[in-house]
UniProtKB/Swiss-Prot annotation:
Protein name: Alanine--tRNA ligase
Manner of cofactor binding, per the entry note: Binds 1 zinc ion per subunit.
Family per similarity comment: Belongs to the class-II aminoacyl-tRNA synthetase family.
GO molecular function: alanine-tRNA ligase activity; aminoacyl-tRNA deacylase activity; ATP binding; tRNA binding; zinc ion binding
The enzyme's E.C. designation: 6.1.1.7
PANTHER family registered for this protein in UniProt: ALANINE--TRNA LIGASE, CYTOPLASMIC, ALANYL-TRNA SYNTHETASE
Function: Catalyzes the attachment of alanine to tRNA(Ala) in a two-step reaction: alanine is first activated by ATP to form Ala-AMP and then transferred to the acceptor end of tRNA(Ala). Also edits incorrectly charged Ser-tRNA(Ala) and Gly-tRNA(Ala) via its editing domain.
Length: 879
């Protein structure tokens, strides 16, 4: 049997032998493409290459691309587990030509690989072409020898691909595999095309046109090729299966689920095992690519996937977290092809377990609510939308999870009602917001980029430079001049030493000067990737386009910033060595006064761990090793051990920053892809100090630290505060900690004494407030400033002393009255503490109370003990 891993390797090796660059799978998080939640097709990483916005050092490429379809336009989530070919995660294999070869070669490559290398019978294959694409039809006859009846012309949009309303487009040709007449279904384009007999295995897109904004369509000067073959679907054919979930990889995951849950893989929980197997893949790969479960965006889609799998595990009997225990089975199947699974195994497992622990507590209660509501509805079919929203809002049930649970009961949900409830919540929670025109502003920078080209950055080697003003902007308007005044303007130079904010490093401050002109720059940003825009105010003279200026950054500020940036690199490596390789950067800020570093880490770091990390960073700084910067290909950098950071987009030539002494395995202590500015030697960073560690969101921790002059200032401030504390305690600084510990112990002892005195007072040593009414002992006391929590303990103590009777204790702590009433067991058939406390609460202006017949508690804004105790006496007289 040909394994899925063998098929993937054979596909890539074949196209590699045909002059294609084998490009590793891109992240599931699209880079610089806010229009997509996830990478949902093999061509997504090459989108800018096809549109001409990006160039690559190769014109042919092949990939096995990770793909997730679980949100937006491409959403297969609801069908997963119930069909043979739907997945949230799958691999899309493909070959691409960027103006290199076209239709003849694409068809030749596909036919040769399928029939020669993979050995598929030629009579089992047929092709579709766009109805107007006679070239493709002729090529299938010539190259593959297909007869007319096996070349099917399709006139619909299914066989014509568009990137969008504008941009590259072209006809498609799809290759189908025929399972034979023993399987129901008709060929593509027929009424029975949805059957399982004919299965699409490969789509060839011939990009030969360009759709213009005015609706016209022109020929592309350099036609291109984009193809896609779903690995899981093709593996099923190669392995003699008609169901993707029967292939070796999927079957191994299903068997792992069956073993852990002690439920037959093909028994009554067959669909649940399939859901778990599929969702395990999307969960693990998304976390490995930096997505963590959250309440919005990509994180929320991940949470939906995870919770759907967890509900199916619960259906099969899971009472504790088990989802994460399936991860080793996935790594065994796919870890060799995707080493990020191995690299981030600890983070993936901890994230899965933590999410399951959080959800398990809510799942049972939510399912109980759902069951109760269905019982209440009777024969009504649809669950009300407000109930579905309550499940979402209170118990964390995504709508599709509720729909999934209802599907098994033959019921549906009122989606319109759910959306109405959701809209009402958004309306309540959302602050008034008005669009700021940022989208229009971005158009300004696109135009500026087209007109002037990219900015030339000189700041790696110089902190000052002569430059020419290319443009001056305010908002969306380009200005003819900018006189001195209070308005901030944006300035574009042909070259600049100013660093534009990116990669976590803040932008430079400084000045632009010319005879009679001075501009103070207070921010520098990058726009459209490679435009450096200076923001500031003209404080003297008038600035005009074309003017020659002298640009100079604030040296002291840049020095502090680059120190913190270099310290961040050392901190990152120290964390990975001290805490674990699952630690990866989730965000950073490198400013003159501090650094902030967000990391993937499921639990808080201990004081000991933070101390060890801080010590390691300082030890590396003391080595004073040189910092080296080199340009190389991304493949060379990764081979050398450089870390590429999540969320950053890199070109084929990357800047690699190495610092610290290396060892036998690595040429340097820290090696990262980075475009920022850094110190010359690590000793220039100066002392390093971690200031705080805190949580940002589930699975993300934040470390804040300072170095250099900022660390020295912190040390002086800390020393000053410590001396102030020692002076107040009237002890030497060295004894301050022990003196504070002694005071805390003394306070603890005094607090216990006060509580004991209050207890004695309440139990009546010399302050008895006990009386007999109608043969019933009443111990009623107003204890003043005593907490409600203490009242209950005192009431229990007094009840034991009087043996038989009623105890009523009141207090007025924190501006609110409280009452506890205790009735001894022998009197509960005559008196109910809950009823008594509710009558008391009414007198106190409260809204009832609660408890048991022998002990109840209530409160209210008033603390009129005389009125309450009078009510109790009257009640006892009538008992």
């Amino acid at each position: 049997m040909t394994s899925t891993n063998d098929i993937r390797s054979a596909f890539l090796e074949y196209f590699g032998s045909q002059g294609h660059r084998i490009v590793p799978s891109a992240s599931l998080v699209p880079q610089n493409d806010p229009t997509l939640l996830f990478t949902n097709a093999g061509m997504v990483p090459f989108k800018n290459v096809f549109t001409g916005q990006e160039t690559r050092p190769y014109s042919r490429a092949t990939t096995a691309q990770k793909v997730v379809r679980a949100g937006g336009k491409h959403n297969d989530l609801d069908n997963v587990g119930y069909t043979a070919r739907h997945h949230t995660f799958f691999e899309m294999m493909g070959n691409f030509s960027f103006g290199d070869y076209f239709k003849p070669e694409a068809i030749e490559f596909a036919w040769t690989l399928l029939t020669r290398d993979f050995g598929l019978p030629k009579d089992k294959l047929l092709a579709t072409v766009y109805a107007e694409d006679e070239d493709a039809a002729d090529l299938w006859k010539k190259i593959a020898g297909l007869s007319d009846d096996r070349i099917i012309r399709i006139g619909t949009s299914d066989n014509f691909w568009r990137m969008g309303d504008t941009g590259p487009c072209g006809p498609c040709s799809e290759i189908f595999y025929d399972h034979g007449d023993s399987v129901f279904g008709g060929p593509p384009g027929s009424p029975d095309e949805d059957g399982d007999r004919f299965v699409e295995i490969w789509n060839l897109v011939f990009m030969q046109f360009l759709d213009q904004p005015d609706g016209s369509r022109d020929a592309l000067p350099r036609p291109s090729i984009d193809t896609g073959m779903g690995l899981e679907r093709f593996a099923a054919i190669m392995q003699g299966k008609r169901d993707n979930y029967d292939t070796d990889t999927m079957r191994a995951l299903i068997e792992a689920s069956a073993e852990i849950m002690h439920q037959d893989a093909d028994g009554p929980f067959k669909a649940s095992h399939r859901v778990v197997a599929d969702h395990l893949r999307s969960t693990a790969f998304l976390i490995a690519d930096g997505v963590l479960p959250s309440k919005e965006g990509r994180g929320y889609v991940l949470r939906r996937i995870m919770r759907r799998a967890m509900r199916h595990l619960h259906i099969m009997g899971a009472k504790e977290p088990v989802f994460y225990r399936l991860l080793p089975a996935l790594i065994q199947q796919m870890g060799a092809a995707y080493p990020e699974l191995v690299q981030h195994q600890a983070l993936i497992a901890q994230t899965m377990k933590g999410e399951e622990e959080r959800f398990t507590a809510l799942l049972e209660r939510g399912l109980t609510l759902l069951s109760d509501e269905l019982d209440r509805l009777g024969d009504k079919e649809a669950l009300p939308g407000d109930v579905a929203f309550k499940l979402y809002d209170t118990f964390g049930f995504p709508l599709d999870l509720t729909q999934d649970a209802l599907r098994e009961k033959g019921r549906t949900v009122d989606e319109a009602g759910f959306e109405t409830a959701m809209a009402e919540q958004r309306k309540r929670a959302r602050a008034a917001w008005v669009g700021s025109g940022d989208a229009a502003a971005e158009t300004v920078w696109f135009d500026a980029r087209d007109k002037h080209g990219p900015s030339e950055f000189l700041g790696y080697v110089s902190e000052k430079a002569d430059a020419e003003v290319q443009g001056i902007f305010r908002g969306n308007d380009e200005l003819a001049s900018a006189p001195a005044g209070d308005d901030t303007v944006a300035i574009l130079l042909n070259q600049t030493p100013f660093y534009g904010e990116s990669g976590g490093q803040v932008g430079d401050h400084g000045t632009l000067t010319a005879p009679g002109v001075r501009v103070e720059i207070t921010d520098t940003q990058k726009r459209n990737g490679d435009l450096i825009v200076h923001y500031g105010k003209v404080v003297e003279g008038t600035l005009k386009p074309g003017m020659a200026v002298h640009a100079e950054i604030d040296h002291a500020r840049r020095t502090a910033v680059r120190g913190h940036h270099s310290a961040t690199h050392l901190l990152h490596e120290a964390l990975r060595r001290q805490i674990g390789t699952h630690v990866t950067q989730k965000g950073s800020l490198n400013a003159p006064e501090r650094l902030r570093f967000d990391i993937s880490q499921p639990r808080p770091l201990t004081d000991e761990e933070l101390a060890a990390v801080e010590a390691e960073v300082n030890a590396r700084i003391r080595e004073n090793a040189p910092v080296e910067t080199r340009l190389m290909t991304q493949e060379e950098a990764v081979a050398e051990g450089a870390m590429a950071l999540f969320g950053e987009k890199y070109g084929d030539e990357v800047r690699v920053v190495s610092m610290g002494k290396g060892d036998d395995d690595r040429p340097a202590y820290s090696i990262e892809l980075c475009g920022g500015t850094h110190v010359g030697r690590v000793g220039e960073i100066g002392p390093f100090r971690i200031v705080s560690e805190s949580g940002v969101s589930a699975g993300v921790r934040r470390i804040e630290a300072v170095c250099g002059l900022a660390a020295e200032a912190l040390a002086l401030e800390t020393e000053s505060r410590l001396k102030q504390i020692a002076d107040l305690l009237k002890v030497p600084v060295a004894d301050a900690a022990s003196r504070v510990a002694a005071l805390l112990e003394e306070r603890k002892s005094l607090t216990a004494q006060v509580s004991d005195l209050q207890r004695k007072l309440a139990t009546g040593e010399g302050t008895s407030a006990t009386e007999s009414i109608n043969g019933i002992t009443l111990s009623a006391r107003d204890l003043g400033d005593v907490s409600p929590k203490e009242l209950k303990g005192l009431a229990e103590s007094i009840s034991k002393q009087i043996a038989s009777g009623v105890v009523a204790l009141m207090s007025s702590a924190d501006g609110r009255g409280s009452i506890v009433i205790a009735v001894t067991k022998d009197l509960t058939d005559r008196l109910d503490a809950v009823k008594l406390v509710r009558e008391a609460s009414a007198l106190m202006g409260g809204k009832g109370g609660g408890g048991r017949p022998d002990m109840a508690q209530a409160g209210g804004p008033n603390a009129d003990s005389d009125a309450v105790f009078a009510m109790l006496r009257k009640t006892l007289e009538a008992a």
